[in-house]
Amino acid sequence: MTLFLPFPLILFILFTLGPAMSEENSLTIHGVTDTLGEDDEQYADALQTAGDVFAEVEALFNDENYESRTGWFKDESNDDGDIVYAKDTSNGRMVTISTELPMPPDFVMKETWEGMETLPEWNQNINFAGVVASPTDNFDIVTYGNNDVLVVSGREFVSARIWRKVDDGYILASRSVKIPSFKSKHKGKVRAHLHIAGARFRPNPANPGTTLTDVVMLAELKGFLPKMIVNQVIGRIMLMDTVTNRSHFRALKEKRDKNAN
């Protein structure tokens, strides 16, 4: 038996089904479209997850209450003037910090994005780090693990990252994803869940050549850690990473300045 469909109906089906299939494999944010090739279609869900978390991170940074820290409380601080603010959410404690990095935003963004695999070389809290897949220039899948920090044993993360140039700066966002084809090489490490991680890099009008940096994070560490313990240490861990990150960029600036002479 021959199945016949009128040509107008065929066009209707192609029109309705075709775009829906392609939309799953592409994402447009701020006029830039990430499109997955055939070999990377397994990352379609991760791409959409990255888009979701980017929207959340951008909305958070643009919220006037974030700028004034309304609804946040002072969690940790140090003698350098760094302050970690926190707020409790249904998914756990969210923490944020703002700092100045001694390099311009273009450099900071490039180093943050491309320097993933070198993290263990200069960050004592990182045990391993690598790129699982890099389907587009603005979207990738990464894995990393931290060493034992304070009372928290090492955790492993697998997350999608995405970035965009926004105005004269950048926004980078990340969230944990499940990649069926990914097999961890680090047995025994608890797989933590990154609900939201984001960074905003902006030029500093008061100090040209430097970058105003805002970082926000909300992670569920899993395992058998009591919530009270997690809340006590998560801000301190962010503070430690901020100091380490700033020292890293200072070293890169010194190297750049030395090579320029």
Protein language model regions, located:
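Eukaryotic helix-grip
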Residues: 4-6, 13-261
